[in-house]
């Protein structure tokens, strides 16, 4: 696999650099008079969406500069599924910045390492290795599970990822198991879970904050923009002329509540970047394939997010 991360990195740095200007204009302070009303109205819309769709919906919106928020079930825990792969790659990039790993470092693997869903690693298994950068790109853009497990092996496993989340100030998000076991989360099980509010805050730290260098942030954002799995979710509801990147997560089986997740950063043309974390548990238990009507719930969340950002 030939990675194009160096070429795309330059394109991604422009919106990241623009965050500082918005911080100066906004004074890093939300409008105390209008924010609560907007947040309450948005929370009501999200609650109404959940009632119409059935199931359980958790959402958090976060203005990356002012800190303005809106949420529904923002503090409740939800299974991350593959949404963990975006912050996982941030942990890898932190290790690169610290000299512990290199972007072009080859990571060996073989047929025995391949999981059921491994589109990129399977296509390249004959080469015997992929680079760290290629694995990050694969696990974000296609949600390649083998790539995620190989990356976890470089940082001390799930516990290593969780330690870095804590170092970045996230006391909620936790990764406990590898793919695919980490998707098996039942009610009351805190393993491999996050809350929408915690995830939105973590995204703020790694995508627009100072947790990573501008170059690393640009890589993460660019891979999110290139993601191929989220076109029917948040990005389907966000305006097409807003630059948006996301990472999906899905857990669908014959004997578990189906999970449809998506986390995103989006760039309104007249405002600072907005972080979105959306986690949806479908009322359908027995489905063994993704349902468009469940993904449409997240598309509606995207539309609500756009209106909230504009207001």
How would you name each of these model-derived features?
Residues 114-150, 158, 192:
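Conserved catalytic neighborhood of penicillin-recognizing serine enzymes
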Residues 62-64, 140-143, 155, 178, ...:
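Active-site-proximal beta-strand/loop segments in catalytic clefts of secreted hydrolases
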